[in-house]
């Protein structure tokens, strides 16, 4: 039996912003996407509604999302897509009306998934296409497989990215392999996947709260839309600094993250935000902003926001940026550093 949207919608209010009736939704697609939004709900994101989408009824029942959508009831009978993206795609097409119903009156949607499996890889492009057709600002933040997950998952992920980028405004790819480079060698596999979930959380939270949280230097929906509408592949940078040089440390970490696989200075548009306690000094704001500027093109359209947040420790500053509108997005989605590994797996001709 599938989920009824009205029955399964949770009663609790997650502070969806009422100003201008702005509605932002985060859709987790497939097993990894459902896990990611469960993590986001646990940690918290201000002003968004969570939607879980899956072909696997058992996994969907474990979701804490505000809304749950079982797709492809006739095709999969609630048993999942079996790692086949074509089944995930057919399932989403079968349930198109359910998806459209959930997306009504939405201004911005985040689609998050782990690519390489069946439901997330196959259904995400369909959901994105529907959202774009409805005039919704559509942003996808997806992970690609660890190499140890095998060549077939990598191949499916690449093919899925090629489909997805046709139907989103902005596509942010997070490489699990690059993420692993930032983890200690003795990290447990469970913790590695948790780190991937946390990175997805930071990305969605960082972008959405630019809009939903009132800033001291404010960025509104129009600012974000100007950077992310029809922007193509994008780069996300996140940094946290502590102590005496917290501003410099946060900005440098954001710009020098191993997740960044392409020079940021090639971007035509950048939006960045500083989240800090109210004790932040003017010189710290200037220092962080200059590091971002120095790593950007002189001609780039750069937008800046500042949010005071009581939840940030007194000795800490957080910096996030999104860089968009690159001349060659293939170099972002399929960087040359990945090509030798891809060839090792016998995937010649895909790129």
Swiss-Prot record:
It holds the Pfam family Tubulin. InterPro entries: Cell_div_FtsZ (IPR000158), Cell_div_FtsZ_CS (IPR020805), FtsZ/CetZ (IPR045061), FtsZ_C (IPR024757), Tub_FtsZ_C (IPR008280), Tubulin/FtsZ-like_C (IPR037103), Tubulin/FtsZ_2-layer-sand-dom (IPR018316), Tubulin/FtsZ_GTPase_sf (IPR036525). One of its GO terms (biological process) is protein polymerization. It is found in: Cytoplasm. GTP binds at residues 31-35, 118-120, 149, 153, 197. One of its GO terms (molecular function) is GTP binding. Its main location: cytoplasm. Keywords: Cell cycle, Cell division, Cytoplasm, GTP-binding, Nucleotide-binding, Septation. GO terms for cellular component: cell division site; cytoplasm. PROSITE patterns: FTSZ_1, FTSZ_2. Essential cell division protein that forms a contractile ring structure (Z ring) at the future cell division site. The regulation of the ring assembly controls the timing and the location of cell division. One of the functions of the FtsZ ring is to recruit other cell division proteins to the septum to produce a new cell wall between the dividing cells. Binds GTP and shows GTPase activity. Belongs to the FtsZ family. Homodimer. Polymerizes to form a dynamic ring structure in a strictly GTP-dependent manner. Interacts directly with several other division proteins. Interacts with FtsA. This is Cell division protein FtsZ. It comes from Thermotoga maritima (strain ATCC 43589 / DSM 3109 / JCM 10099 / NBRC 100826 / MSB8).
